[in-house]
Structure formats: C-alpha cells, structure tokens
Amino acid sequence: MTQNPSSDRRPDTAQSVANGETLDGALFTGLTDTAAAQDESSETSASFATIDGEDKSEVGDALDWFSDGKETDINGDEADRGIQADTQAKTLVSLENLTEEPEIDGAEFMAEAFIAENTAVEDVSPNPNPAIDTDALAALTQSAVELTPPPPINLPKVELPPMQPLAPLMAIADPDNLSPMSTSIQAPTQSGGLSLRNKAVLIALLIGLIPAGVIGGLNLSSVDRLPVPQTEQQVKDSTTKQIRDQILIGLLVTAVGAAFVAYWMVGENTKAQTALALKAKHSHRNLDQPLAVAGDELAIADQTIDALSAQVEKLRHQQDLSLKQAELLTELSRANLSDIDEIQGVIQKNLDQARALFGCERLVFYYHPRYQPEAMVVQALDLTTQGLIDSKDPHPWGQEDMPSQIVAINDTSGASISNPHRQWLEQHQVKASLTVPLHRDNYPLGLLMAHHCQRPHQWEMRERQFLQQLTEELQTTLDRANLIQERNESAQQAQILKELTLKISAAINSEQVFDIAAQEIRLALKADRVIVYRFDATWAGTVIVESVAEGYPKALGATIADPCFADSYVEKYRSGRIQATRDIYNAGLTPCHIGQLKPFEVKANLVAPINYKGNLLGLLIAHQCSGPRDWHQNEIDLFGQLTVQVGLALERSDLLAQQKIAEVEQRQMREKMQKRALELLMEVDPVSRGDLTIRAHVTEDEIGTIADSYNATIESLRRIVTQVQTAASQFTETTDTNEVAVRQLAQQANRQALDVAEALERLQAMNKSIQAVAENAAQAESAVQRATQTVDQGEDAMNRTVDGIVAIRETVAATAKQVKRLGESSQKISKVVNLIGSFADQTNLLALNAAIEAAHAGEEGRGFAVVADEVRSLARQSAEATAEIAQLVATIQAETNEVVNAMEAGTEQVVVGTKLVEETRRSLNQITAVSAQISGLVEAITSAAIEQSQTSESVTQTMALVAQIADKNSSEASGVSATFKELLAVAQSLQEAVKQFKVQ
C-alpha cells in the first residue's frame, strides 16, 4: 500500500504546537486539497472509527495539517482506500496530540480506521461482521510504527502559557475581552444526537426491514386469502409464483431504497469533506471564516478546525507582536540622544508605541532620581481614556515605599491593597494595573505602570516580561542621556574654569579674587550660597566674602569657631581634602555642627581648602539650601580646581602688590642717586681742565663710594702725570745722546749685510758642484746595480742551463735503455718468427701428405685434396710473410744498435757540456762578487757626496739666514735711527702736553 510522503511528520509537528512553539504561516502552506479530489472519486464513502468508546469523524486527507511545507496533490482516481484510511488515522492522531488527551495506540487506531473504511458501504447490509483484509491491516500498522519525527524548526522559542485542549473542550474567547498578547481559547460545544455511522445503520435497517416486512405481510395475507384449489399442485405452484414475485418486488424496492439512502448519505458526507478540505487548504488565508456543518462529528471537526485556526491566528498575531516589541526595544536602544532635552520626547514616542502594542489604556513612566528637585512623568493614553495623571501625584506610593518587585493587580475591586492605594486607583479609573519598579543601588528611582481602565485584565507572564524589558531599556536610555549630560557639563565646566581663571587672573588684590570667585562659582555650580571662610591665628574663622541667592539668610561677617578643627582637620585640608556632603542631617555630623549650619538653612555643602604658599589660609564653601543635593564627581572636581585657581590668584595678587612697592622704592632710590651724581659731576668738573688737585666730597651712599673711587683715580692720575713729566725729560735727554750711536750702528749693519751676501753666493756655487758629484755617484751606483742584476740573471740562466743539460743526460740515458730493451724485444720477435716459419714448413709438409693421401683415396678424397691444397697455399704464404718479418726485425735490430751508439755519444757530449757550464758559472760568481764590491764603493761615494751636498746646503741655508738677519739688522738699525728721531719729537711733544697739568 502506498503511503503519503507528506504525512510522516504530522504527529510530531502537531506535538510541537501543543508544546507551545511558535509557528508562522509557512507551516500551513502544506495543507493539501485531497478532499477536493475525493469529490471526483467514485470510491469515496463516509467512514467512521470508534476510539475508546467515542465516535471520531473521519475527515480524510483534508486534515493533513502539518506537512513539511510542500503542498501534496492526490488525484482521486489514483487514491485507494488504504491511503485514505492511513491519512485519516494520522489526522486523528494529530488531533489527539493537539488536544493533549491520553495517547491512543497508533496501530490499533489505524486498524479500526481501516475496518471502518472497508465497511462504510456494506453497513447497510444485514451482515454485521464484514471481512477484514489482514494484510492491509498489517501494512497500515507497520506504516504507523515507522513514522519519523520532523526536523526541528529554526524559529525563536517564545514561552507560552499552558494551552487548553483543542477538542472537545476548546473554546474561543471573546476578542473584545482579550489584549493583543492574550492566547486563551474556548472549546467548541459538542453537538448532541447520533453519529453519522449510527444514523446510516438505522436508516439502512429501516429501509431494508420495513419494505421486506410490508411485502412479507402482504404476501402472507395474500396467501391466507387465496382460495384452496382442488388440485394441490396448482395451489402450490400458484402460491410459489406469487411469493416469488412479491419477494422479487420487495428485494427490488429494498435495493432501490438502500441505493437511494446510500447515495444521499455519500453525497452529504462528500459535501462536508469537500468543504472541510477547502477550509483546511485555505486556512492560512481565511482563518477567521467559520464553516457551517451539521451537528455531528463533522461539525465537531469543523469547530475544531475553527478553534485551531483561531489559535494559529493568535500565535501568528503573538509572533508579530513579539517582533514589533523587539523592534520597539531596538529602536529605543538606538535612539539618537544628541541633547539631554530630547530624552522626554524620545520616551514619549516609544511609550505611545508600546501602549499600542501592549493593548492597555494608559502607560505611565515616572522617574525621580535622588536629590533632584523635579520628577519626570511621561504618559501615553488611548483616545477613549480621559484624564491625565497629575505629575505631582503620579503613583499611589511614597518615595520610600515604592515597591521593589513587579506588582500585578488583575482586578482592583477585589485586590488586597491599602485604602490610599485603592482610592488612587479609583480616582484614575484603573481596573487592572501592572507596575514595574526602577531601582539603582537599592534606591527607587521610578516606575513604569500599565493600566486597563475599561475592565479587569488577567496579566500574563509575557506582558510582565515585556514591561520589564521596556523598563530596563528606558533605564539604559536614561543612563545614556545622563552620560551625554555629564559630557556636556564637563565641557561647560572646562569652559567655566577657563573663563573664571581669566577673570581671577585679572584681579589686582585678594578682595577682588574672593569676590569674583564666590560669585562665579555659585553661578557655575548653581548653588544657593558660596562663602570664603578665613582662619585667624587660633583657627577660628570669619566669613569674609559671600555670594548668596535671594531668599536665603546672609552669612557675611559671621564668626564660626570649631574647637576640634585644629586637631582633626587642619592637616587634612592642608593636604587638599575636599568634603562633599549630600545631606547634613544624614551625614553623621555632631549636633554642634548642625547647629552652626542650621541658621543659614544649609541642607548640603561642598568644602575645599584655600592654600597659600603651603599654608591653610581658609575654606571655600558651597551651600545648597533648597534641599539635599547629590554632588556629582565632575562638580567636585571643578570646585577643587577652582579653589586651586583661587590660591594661585592670591599668590599672583601678592606678587603684583610686592612688585608695585618695589617699583616705588626703586624710583625714589633712582631719583636720589641722580641728585648725588649731579653734585659729584659739579665737584669734579675742574679735573676736565687739568686741575688734578681737586677732590670730591665723600658720603656714605653709593655716590660716596663712587666719589671715593674717583678721588683715588685722580690721585693715581696725578702721580702718573708727575712720573710722565719726569720720564719725558729723561727720555728726551737719552734720545739726544743715543741718536749718533744708533746712526753708526745702522751703517755697520749695512756693510755686514753686503759681506754676508757675497759669502752666500760662494756657498751656493760650491753647493751646486757638490750636488753634481752626488748625481754622478748616484748614476754610477745605478749602473753597478744594473750590472749586478745582469750578472745575477746570467747566473740564474747558467743554473737553468746546467739543470737542463742534466735532465737531457738523464733523458738520453733512459732513452738508451729503452732502445736496448727494444733491441732485445726485436730479438724475441725474431725467435717467434723463426718458430712460425718452422710451423709453416711443418704445415706445408702435412698438407702435402694429406694431398697424397687424398690422391690415393680417389673420388672420395677429392674434396679433402682441395682442402689440403688450400692449407699448403696458406702455409706457403705464411712462410713468405715470416721471411719478410724476419728481414724487418733484422733491420730494426740494426737501426736500434745505431741509435744506441748515437745515444751513448750524445751522453758523453752532454757530460762535457755540463762541465763547461760549471766552469762558466764559477766565473760568473767571481764577477758577481767583484760587482758587489764595486757597488759598495760607489754607494759609499754616493753617500759621502750626498752628505757633503746636504752639509753644503745646510751651510748655504745658514748663510742665507745670516744674510737675512744682516739685512734685517740693517733695516732695523735704519728704523731705530728713524724711531729715535720720532721719539725725540714725541718726547718733546709729551713735555709740552704734561706742562698743562697742575699737580702741586
């Protein structure tokens, strides 16, 4: 039996739906239209199966719910009953899995379905036990056991609430009472009355029995009314004929009635199945169109299909809703927050979208960070809800009583809540409420509340999760906005620090520094008061500068003494401590400290030290009087940096004041010195006219030091002038006396220079002669060296000649030996040739004998005779060749002997040549020795000539120097003579110059 290839995945896919997995519309595209094909099949019939005592409708391949995504078309002409029964059984098994009813054995169920299929038409007959095809039943059982589960569906898993059974207890809830996220369903009601099978059996029995009973009664009555004929055979024949005719008529009527009933029932069944198939085929497009069917199993199946379609629609709607929610959260996480002012608009937009997806009438977001004066309240309402929540009373809890977990109220009328809470809910017409808290460091920051104002609502886990995710995403968005705000504030604070530093730098004294700092810091921090608190020697302090907002008490001039400050806080503040107090009443301060701050309405403060040249000068304090304040770290850092700038500005102002005082003192000192300098110039003015007897008045200031130094200088100058006058007189006298002697000395120097020049010329001539001798000696030495080299080369050539002759002698001796060996070898060849000749003679003799023997043999030995002749011819040729070889050997021996003799004669000549070469080499050695002696002598002569030339040159140079010295002396003598003349004129001029100085 052929099995539908798309039916092996139905039970597990249906079980996936029962387990709550999300299915999209693609899973329903595999619904087949086989029921439409059944409408054309002549074998289509209504069949029923009984499962555990309950009648289940057989809907055929039209309920092929969960295939692998491909539509399967089955031609009704080709589909057999086994395929139809198999498909129907799997469909019912899928329905049973979907409704989560107790499991039914697949083989037993298919067997019953097969029985019902095979007995659908025969049920009209009286036979209650039709035959069962056991082979087909076994095949069906095997096909049911071998069903394989489908592969897993790669879809996102969404946690769903437990599903209600689809049939027979499944119900569709009123859509008006459901939120877009609700998945509750209502089972269809089961129709009363008999099943289709019982109806068909009852009608078939009635149609079959009533006509038969009527006809039988008529026959019986007719038989009873028949007259008794005379002849029994005629009566019997007549009665038999009538009964037979009546039976035939009854059977014909029964057959016609049964055929009519069967045709009508099959038509109705096929009509319902066709409608169900069309609905199942188009269920993924027309899930919301109900189908009206009669109130039996088909009607129940129709209601089941409607319920399942509604649930699938709910699942699809839920999946779309989850996708939109995810898109909303993603859009919120990617919101562009270029400015902190945009945050409320972004939250408002996303709350409107979230409320539409959530299906509630009101969605309220309340956010109030710690120590912030105002809270953020954002509301999203539908068009039917009237009245916004007051931003001053946005929720029914106090700030400290806000819930720490999700609070879900399905019905406010019956919820166990406090009276204020109930009153608040009734005031705002809240019927159901879901609240998600927002915390940071265990401190409640806000709430996200969803309200149903029309009717109570059962909050599902999915709704709680979405609202919690939305709350977390809103918190993330607010954190991003806070980071942007902190970044902008940091940039603003940097600009404030820059501007304030420039303003403080422009202050010329400490009062201006403190005034500017207090005013600008209060505006920068948006504080209510900023004061400068300065210490005295006992570490008690006074408020010397104050900048305070309107409406708060003034602290300027207040004196505050803290007896514990010197022991506990001086070193801490000196090292740069900055103390930030969010709330003075919850900071652990002593009652004394709180009492000092309370008159000024201080709720929070920020304290930083003012250090001046390493000493603690005072404190810069910022007060928040409107309420507690959570000082941010960037504000604390800015406050500390500004305090440092105040200290630097104080140092700068002190330096400026000191600089001004120094400038005044320097100006007064300069004016005084200028006056004394003028007096000094007037006192020493006679010195410029040559009066060295004047003395300046000495005082105790710097000018007095200059006057004293000036007096000492004038005194030294007076002594020098006196000495110059004396020296000039003496010099004049000396110059007059030595002028004649210097003139004579110049003349003698000139004569000496001429004599030296003449001697120098003679020395130069002798030097040239010595250089010529040295050059000739050098040339002779070069010639001797070349001769020595030539002799050495000749000696080397003689040595090589001797070596060559010796080698020739050895070669000739070796050649002679080889030639002798060649002669001996030729003698051996001669012996061999003689031996070969004897062999040839013997061969010739043997050949002759063989020829004779062949002749004796006659015809038989003729061939052997020819061979013998050939052998004898060869022997003769061998003898001739042997004779020629012997002659050649003899010739070789003779020539060898001649060569040996020539070699011996050459050897003797080589020996004689060797002796001659040895004698020549000894002569060359003697020549070499003589050349070496000559070379030594020439070298000595050359050295002596060179030495004489050098000595002569040195003497020449010395004489040249002497000549130069003589010339120089002559010129210097002339110069000295001229100088003496000039000195005489200078001495006379000096005497005239020093006469104008008054030294006594």
UniProtKB/Swiss-Prot annotation:
Gene3D superfamilies: 3.30.450.40, Methyl-accepting chemotaxis protein. It comes from Synechocystis sp. (strain ATCC 27184 / PCC 6803 / Kazusa). Keywords: Repeat, Transducer. Belongs to the methyl-accepting chemotaxis (MCP) protein family. GO terms for cellular component: membrane. GO terms for molecular function: transmembrane signaling receptor activity. Residues 671-722 form the HAMP domain. Residues 342-478, 509-650 form the GAF domain. The lineage of its organism: Bacteria, Bacillati, Cyanobacteriota, Cyanophyceae, Synechococcales. This is Putative methyl-accepting chemotaxis protein sll0041.
